[in-house]
Amino acid sequence: MARPHRVRLRGPAEPPRRGHLPFADAPGVPDPIEVGSRVLTRGGRPWFPVSGEFHYSRYPAGEWEEELLKMKAGGVTVVAAYVIWIHHEETEGRVRFDGDRDLRRFAELCARHGLDFIPRIGPWVHAEVRGGGLPDWVLARTAAPRTDDPAYLAPVRAWYRAIAEQLRGLDRAGGGPIVAIQIENELYDQPDHLLTLKRMAQEAGLSAPLWTSTAWGGVRLPPDELLPLYGGYPETFWTEADGGWPDTCRKHFFFTHQRDDEGIGADLRPTTVRGGDPEELSDRFPWATCELGGGMAVAYHRRPRVEAADVGALGLTKIGCGSVWQGYYMFHGGTNPPGDLTPLQESHATGYPNDLPRLTYDFQAPLGEYGQYRPSYDELRLQHLLLADFGGLIAPMESVLPERLPTGQHDRETLRWAVRADDRSGFLFVNNHQPHEPLPHRPDTSFEVEFPGDGPVLSLPSAPVTIPQGAYFCWPLRLEVAGLRLDWATAQPVCTVDDGHGRTILVLAATDGIAPELALDLRTVTTVSAPSDAEVTTAGDRALVTALRPGTDALVEVDTADGRRVGVLVLDAATARGAYRGPAWGAERLILSADGGVVFDAHADEVRLHSAAGEPSFAVLPAPRRAPVVPGALVKEAEDGVFVRYTVVAGDDGRTGDDVLPVTLVRPAGEAPPVTTGVMGRASVPAEAYFDSAAAEYRVALPDDPPPGTLLRLHWTGDVGRAYVGERLVADQFYSGRVWEIGLGRLPVGELRVRVLPLAGGAPVYVPGRVGDAAIPAELLRAECATVRPWPLRPG
């Protein structure tokens, strides 16, 4: 038998520092925010924010509110958004904050739904936008943008004043949602300019307890003026087509205490920096992030595919590494506005090293360009439920690495794991997933965790297990819930919920391929009752629950020594990925939905289920006294373990399934365009003329008056696809092997034409699944539409 993987928790070498940083709310602000060396606090309590990036100016304003509710239901507590200057002032002096550019309304919607807000005000933001967000007229005025050149600072000062006017009264001193403001972006070597920008923003009237800066690339910051925020992506669009999977991405699937990622933005830095953490940053500031990859954009020359497990494993690994702020870029995709004068995407034509699609900025995000739910949304929501209940416990815990560590970033044989713990309890993190190069199964695995003091070493599980390929998880150690101490469990904490009868239920998610076991501290327990198929054995001060079949009925009931009632419910992994918790019909409830996404709308006093199923179902704990009501539909109910399951039977035909649409070939493709290159010798998007002369053209017969939420799904191959209504470009895509989705509700009335260019053999373009440098023909193979219907679930 292999020897256990072991870690010894010695406690911190020195206590965390407090009061040494100037970040704080104004006097008198309720629940003031403060920053210590290892943790953020709010109202004196550890605070573990979860921020998600959503660019309001890349999304229809009429849909903002529902998308913010989706983000909140996904566990996002803070919405971050670039304020993209060129979107607001493409023409000098014509500053627009109307429609999709209404910054104030967006911030107010965040506040309305209890979400904090972080405007990332630039002025240079990157964001794969033309000029990094700097309008052309600004760049024409100065030879030294992003410096203290007076010719640059003058328009920036006016821009900051315009932002401040929009956000007036929305700071925390005024009861508003703004918890932080980011200055600039990826500016690593000009601390004096960063300080100038901060002072200008403050003089303009902007205010927040936290002023932040991106901190990757060996950043130099003005001392104690900006909170450094870090990032990490599972893939890149900005590296070379033939460069393979970058080591700077590989590192994020290991447990490490190195915060910096020297790879982010490296294509725009004139010098090569070596990743590292200046001692004054890592010792003075907590590990906070703003750009953990929720997905990845695609460039013409490099089109990475990011899968849900890539996003989920990276996020969970960062918590194990010591993160106290999970910030995702992007959490929600969008579409570039068309621009009045020029296209607004990053491109070779503007001197940038990457050609991006003109319109789509989907980013393969957890919520897509048209609000689509992605599997990565479920993976992250499961982690965010954990943080909502236990983040305050985890945040001050130190990250401790085990005795045996991987020998380097190409070591696939050594188990990757870490523990977050204090001297009383902790969480054990394991990651056995990475993209591109799968990690092997880990047979005969067990752990020993030695807490400080004279207590016994915690050994788990009861017998060694095999950790499956692709698994990543967090297991609790000595977790106390409502008077019960759970010594350990081989299942991940999800959340707690009151069952409506005075009993607290701790919900756990089983790890695929590993039998769930619960070790209960008998000193906190008087009675234990388990399902009939489970086994309960006792030894010393511990009761061990084994042979538990996870599911909605896998409830272990406990009476605690202090007179409380506790349940431990172990869901199977697939069911747990459909777990939502929020205020519903007068109480906090746990909802399980495998048929679509759930949002909680307290203002409308309803829950909405976004589902493509003809008869969607969902399970609720605790169940309301009367079944929810769906206008125009019948709601059936049935027991489902400790839940009540409701099924919606539509009064209409309820059709939401996929419908195949007629596709007509208007013109076959010609010869693939020759390859041209731009900055850094990277392949460029073919010239506009080729879309008229070389592209295959198809006509897609769209349904008349499609219901809201209808997506067109195009199965295709080729190089570049563009969709038109009349002469207007309405959607575009670089081929990466994925189905191309277009929201029909965004399209003007008219015939849809799709043009597809073929990819030439030998083209220096990375396409996942491409065999060598083979040509890819231009074909629209199938078109279908599917409707995701919002079902309002109202109190019965």
Predicted regions and their residues:
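The substrate-binding groove and active-site-proximal loops of carbohydrate-active enzymes
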Residues: 48-61, 84-103, 138-158, 177-191, ...
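Catalytic-core region of carbohydrate-active enzymes that cleave or remodel glycosidic bonds
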Residues: 115, 197-209, 256-354, 420-423, ...
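Aromatic-lined carbohydrate-recognition surfaces of secreted/lumenal glycan-active proteins
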Residues: 120-123, 172-185, 201-223, 264-273, ...
